[in-house]
Amino acid sequence: MTRVLYPLVLALALIALRPAAATLEQPRRIVAVGDVHGAADAFAAILTRAGLIDAEKRWIGGRAILVQTGDMTDRGAGMREALDLLMGLENQASKAGGAVHAILGNHEVMNMVGELRDATPQIFETFGGEAAMRDAFGPKGHYGRWLRRKPMFAKIDGTVFMHAGIGPDYLKPSLDELNRNVRREIEAWDEGVRWLVREKRVTTQPEPRAAMDAARAEIERINALAEEGKATPDMGRTAQLLLPVANVGQSSLFAENGPMWFRGFSLWEEQPALQLIDQLLERHRVRRFVTGHTVQRGGTITERFPGKLFLIDTGMLGRPSFPNGRPSALVIEGETATPLYLH
């Protein structure tokens, strides 16, 4: 054994003595795109303008990084086409040495739990009906499986990308902790709904309100039995299983000030909030935040707290939902962040 180890140690020593490369790798080009909401043509157009795809919608961005900050879904009839494009580019970019990062938005989460209030008849038609769309975004569905692997935050080269923001109730956790928490909450929802379906308390892929009501009814039934001393340990475990469904409105998935819905980054007054923004940047060891969620007036990307926060939802879907909206992207190269528009 000793004679085998000596050559390895010698080889490691020789490697350690080699001089480091003299050239430093340049920062990778990052292109961030905000809320798409089914505007498939506009999404493809801004990616083309940014030099990421060709006329056939194939990746030509090389080592560039595309970040989409959530809300690909709902409202626009091209929702499925836009999702398919993003999913396809993820694989193509990886093979070319680049990357695609898809961030969860509140509308993706809504779709995953079966809340389809912002889906239109035209969207349902592209899936073959409302029931088929629910299946597609369920735990075993084509889009549901893909989305359940996606984060709420991505930290890339000194920038944190997210859909909405980080409110006062979420200042302490790390980004990894926040990402793990949202994944746990989605998994807990799925597990609770599976029980409700299996026990025939709800139909397959129920609407969220039906699942919440059924979960609460079952918990109340178990509590009543517990007061009479008739509840079994299995019933207690069932109640724990159903609590995340019954109380999903208080989870980070749907809380008004949670990371999926918070609008403070757009609404905070500049001077009072500057210290808080600086604290957040220091907490997460980054130089800037990039977020969507809140449509910016005039269809232009907004820079706040000079250079520290960029709001990139410019209402890409356009009329009638966002009359002044237009496609846009934020191009980040090292220290520089530059808005990009079609016109």
Language-model region placement:
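Bacterial N-terminal signal peptides that target proteins for export
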Residues: 1-8
